[in-house]
Amino acid sequence: MNAVKEDVEKLVQKELESANQRFPMFRSDHEGAAVIFEEIEEAEHELNEVRFEFKEMWRSVKLNIGGIPFCEAVLKRSLNLACEAIQVAAMAQKFIDSQKEREKSEQL
């Protein structure tokens, strides 16, 4: 995991920059939490799909009928899961940044 952590952090930053170009900072903690929750739900969905495809792959392996199509699905869904996890991290950073920005403007 350490071999790619720095790369993932860069991808989180890239996702955050893209989101910030398209959408304003969170207006409240409630809004930020709702967006993070939505991203977590999407990540959970992809994880459930990974589990399903792996179970089918494992069933095929145990029956000696091959499991490549299911393993290809595991690969695809795992990549989707990684993207969703990056979005969760980016929105968590946006939450932090939004709160700091609101605190700064309240002090003025």
Residue ranges of predicted features:
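Flexible "arm" and connector segments at domain edges
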Residues: 1-108
